[in-house]
Amino acid sequence: MKYCKKSFFLVALLFTSLPSFPADFGIVKGSDNQVIELVRMNNLLPEYTRQAVRYGIEGSVKVQFNVDTFGAVLDPFVVESNPPGLFERASIKAVRKLIYQPPVFEDQAVNVESVQVDIVFKLQ
């Protein structure tokens, strides 16, 4: 019986602690700072760390990366993290799995630079 209670608690916790992604924009490489919107083909969410769940910690991470002409994420890195040291690894891992619709500008497939996503970790 104890096992069932723990399983239910874990499932309930997973549904109440999902991070969220806002819309994504980036700069067309080689353009005069032309900004375009990127369309996600998937929306993989990072895992909320056990330590953060255990202690009720919420936070956010800003990740920057480039997107190639096929829609793949390149070179993600953390720009800002609050609190530092807790959510960065999960955020980078999730961002690497994102796939975008191949970006097009003026009927040409383009590379997009300086895409930033803010990932918010919030317990509900």
Give the location of each predicted region.
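Boundary of Sec targeting at the N-terminus
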Residues: 23-24
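A short acidic/small-residue loop/turn micro-motif
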Residues: 80-86
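Short, acidic, Ser/Thr-enriched surface-loop or helix-capping motifs
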Residues: 67-68, 73, 104
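Bacterial N-terminal signal peptides that target proteins for export
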Residues: 1-9
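Short proline/glycine- and basic residue-enriched helix-capping loop/turn segments at helix->loop/beta transitions
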Residues: 29-64, 91-124
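N-terminal signal peptide c-region/cleavage motif recognized by signal peptidases
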Residues: 16-20
